């Protein structure tokens, strides 16, 4: 007797046929086009809409960070691009989306086994949806970053092409792998170093180019070494101060403001703040696995502060918590970030998770090769506000994209493309995706064409944003 199955399990040929059929309906060449819709929303208006739920005193800081360049503007413009992607061609091959897969949302961090991994690291906008959305967000970010760094048009095109080509080629590999092999696939420190050395070996026949690649490799290795030192003890040296024999978080407004200085902001007394913090901490612990909860219970919550992070997230409520284990030399910093409605939910089916913190945690666990053991979620004092929790620094490292030359950014594009494909292969169908993407370069050429056109649009939007600041429509505080 064959048991009834609640989940469909098509065979390899059926999965491959699905991908090839999608080519007929949505040719790969169709992804090259970008033209703003006649009823395209005002990009500045979309940002103003986001600002209504953000901390009023931090909104000008967000604007100031976005004003730095078209690249930083793009980092904060996920809502604008979500609106633009709606209506673009999609093949009907859905995956768990990062939702904001620009090149600065990739980075290094420690796995639970203490191995340094490279992966996506921001999931605030995660939602199931068309794989093309993440690929286009990633690829366009490489074009915009390349222009920001002063690359020639040819170099910008080559870098962007590499990101999409790497995605396509990696998906071809994942299509041949077993299900568990895909799930366990990861890019660790050794893989990154090997990729850099492989690039250096290829450049060896060209002495001038070889020197450039060697410098890029040295910079990459140095960044990885630096990541190893970024832990809670290092964070304590930067964010903590010893007062009356006990550590607390330093005050550096508006970037870091301890809760002891924010009582009036939230309309609470000191005792009410203390009670609220511990209630939140208990609620968060309840979302952890039993063994992880027991581990966390060995730490005492010592202090909490509001801390500004990133570009696009500025103005959403974000806090850090200082915890102490066996003694003052055993700290743990946790980050608590507000999780709002995904920018994609205006255009895609709503998340099955009503709690947006849980939505973020699920997306992160689905897409990352390994995730923080302290990932959890809570509701705020205002039950309409949702939060997710994670470690603040756990060997976290990021690439200095704005300092990269073409060789370095091309290598980075290769790594990011592979990583995004691996993340998509975990939740999507790599066989169907590979069958759709094909063996030739048509897909990446189309994505590179789209990225060039969208980078032009981003520059126009940045100009409109800058004009809104100059006119007084938006307030911006720069340099913070």
What kind of feature is each model-predicted range?
Residues 1-10:
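General secondary-structure propensity
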Residues 10-11, 15-29, 35-98, 103-228, ...:
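Conserved ATP-binding subdomain of kinase catalytic cores across diverse folds
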Residues 190-276:
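Long, low-complexity segments enriched in small/aliphatic residues
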């Amino acid at each position: 007797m064959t048991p009834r199955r609640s989940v469909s399990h098509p065979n390899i040929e059926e999965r491959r046929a699905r991908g090839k059929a999608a080519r007929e309906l949505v040719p790969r060449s169709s992804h090259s086009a970008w033209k703003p819709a006649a009823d395209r929303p005002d990009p500045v208006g979309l940002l103003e809409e986001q600002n209504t739920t953000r901390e009023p005193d931090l909104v000008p800081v967000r604007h100031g960070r976005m004003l730095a360049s078209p690249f930083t503007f793009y980092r904060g413009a996920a809502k604008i691009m979500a609106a633009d992607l709606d209506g673009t061609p999609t093949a009907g091959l859905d995956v768990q989306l990062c939702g904001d897969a620009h090149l600065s949302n990739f980075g290094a961090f420690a796995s639970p086994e203490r191995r340094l991994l490279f992966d996506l690291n921001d999931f605030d906008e995660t939602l199931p949806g068309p794989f093309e959305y993440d690929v286009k967000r990633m690829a366009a970010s490489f074009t915009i970053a390349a222009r920001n760094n002063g690359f020639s048009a040819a170099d910008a095109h080559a870098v962007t092409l590499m990101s999409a080509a790497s995605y396509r080629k990696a998906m071809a590999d994942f299509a041949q792998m077993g299900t568990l092999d895909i799930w366990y696939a990861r890019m660790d420190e050794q893989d990154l170093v090997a990729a850099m050395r492989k690039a250096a070996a290829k450049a060896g026949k060209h002495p001038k180019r070889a020197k450039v690649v060697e410098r890029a490799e040295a910079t990459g290795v140095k960044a990885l070494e630096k990541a190893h030192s970024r832990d809670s003890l290092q964070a304590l040296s930067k964010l903590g101060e010893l007062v009356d024999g006990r550590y607390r978080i330093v005050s550096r407004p508006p970037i870091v403001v301890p809760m002891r200085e924010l009582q009036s902001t939230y309309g609470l007394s000191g005792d009410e703040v203390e009670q609220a913090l511990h209630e939140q901490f208990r609620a968060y612990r309840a979302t952890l696995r039993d063994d992880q909860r027991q581990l966390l219970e060995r730490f005492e919550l010592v202090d909490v502060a509001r801390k500004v992070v990133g570009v696009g997230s500025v103005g959403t409520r974000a806090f850090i918590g200082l915890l102490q284990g066996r003694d003052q030399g055993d700290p743990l910093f946790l980050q608590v970030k507000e999780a709002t409605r995904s920018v994609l939910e205006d255009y895609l089916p709503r998340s099955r998770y009503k709690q947006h913190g849980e939505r973020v945690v699920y997306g992160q666990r689905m897409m990352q090769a390994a995730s923080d053991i302290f990932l959890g979620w809570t509701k705020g004092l205002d039950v309409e506000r949702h939060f997710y929790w994670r470690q603040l620094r756990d060997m976290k490292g990021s690439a200095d994209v704005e300092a990269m030359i073409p060789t370095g950014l091309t290598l980075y594009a290769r790594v990011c493309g592979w990583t995004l494909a691996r993340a998509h292969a975990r939740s999507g169908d790599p066989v169907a995706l590979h069958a759709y993407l094909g063996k030739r370069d048509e897909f990446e050429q189309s994505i590179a064409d789209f990225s060039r056109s969208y980078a032009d649009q981003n520059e126009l939007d940045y100009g409109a944003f800058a004009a809104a600041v100059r006119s007084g429509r938006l307030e911006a505080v720069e340099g913070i």
